[in-house]
């Protein structure tokens, strides 16, 4: 069954934006919105491991934030969330390139309605801090979702809002077939961000969840 056979398009306004959202129905039953959560990188000891800083490993933080987010979404019957790494030992691909390709393949073949990739940042300058969200293109559903997620994270965690940015070269943004975004939660190399990334992983997940809820007009 394809989405077009069950899709209902309507126009609504959320926080001043004119938006078109697809709400999926089968008969009189609303179908769950499918969100693919990509926890960036692979476990320690394998290819495509992440950044490090202040004793923290990116791949460990992204894994746990993703688990928290999936649990929040899957406890709401309006959503169906899947993880790229359902266990902390899950390894995707055999090289950096195939690791990224596997994440995209999983999302496209499901197929997901939205794709959210979770990462942590680093910088040689330890004073650089804050949250950033990357998109393939502006004036899209991904941008509107990203703005609400950014607001949610800043409210829940208190990181600096570094804005919504374009990076169409990112593989997971340019090869996915649905609205996609990549969140850099904060900088592992900044002491303040690192403390938040260590202690506030559930709050990061809840901020993302809150943004998703607001995007759909559920909160």
Question: Which residues are covered by each model-predicted region?
Answer:
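Extreme N-terminal basic, low-complexity initiation segments
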Residues: 2-8
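Short, Lys/Arg-enriched N-terminal segments with co-localized hydrophobic residues
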Residues: 9-30
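Catalytic-core regions of hydrolytic enzymes
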Residues: 25-131, 135-144
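Active-site-adjacent mobile loop/cap segments within catalytic or ligand-binding domains
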Residues: 33-36, 47, 105, 110, ...
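Sec-exported extracytoplasmic/periplasmic mature domains
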Residues: 67-78, 108-112, 150-158, 209, ...
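Conserved beta-strand segments of alpha/beta enzyme cores
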Residues: 80-82, 163, 179
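Active-site-adjacent substrate-binding region
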Residues: 140-166
């Amino acid at each position: 069954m394809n989405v077009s056979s069950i899709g209902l398009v309507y126009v609504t306004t959320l926080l001043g934006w004119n938006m078109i959202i697809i709400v999926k129905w089968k008969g009189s039953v609303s179908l769950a919105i499918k969100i693919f959560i990509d926890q960036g990188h692979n476990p320690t000891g394998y290819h495509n491991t992440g950044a490090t800083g202040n004793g923290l490993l990116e791949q460990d933080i992204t894994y746990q934030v993703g688990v928290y987010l999936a649990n929040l979404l899957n406890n709401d019957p309006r959503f169906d969330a899947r993880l790229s790494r359902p266990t902390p030992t899950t390894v995707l691909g055999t090289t950096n390139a195939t690791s990224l390709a596997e994440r995209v393949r999983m999302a496209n073949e499901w197929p997901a309605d939205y794709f959210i990739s979770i990462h942590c940042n680093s910088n040689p300058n330890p004073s650089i801090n804050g949250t950033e969200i990357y998109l393939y293109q502006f004036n899209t559903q991904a941008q509107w979702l990203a703005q609400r997620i950014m607001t949610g994270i800043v409210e829940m965690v208190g990181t600096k809002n570094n804005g919504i940015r374009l990076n169409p070269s990112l593989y997971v943004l340019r090869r996915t077939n649905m609205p996609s975004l990549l969140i850099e939660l904060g900088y592992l190399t900044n002491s303040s961000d690192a403390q938040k990334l260590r202690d506030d992983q559930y709050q990061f997940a809840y901020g993302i969840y809150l943004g998703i809820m607001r995007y759909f007009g559920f909160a």
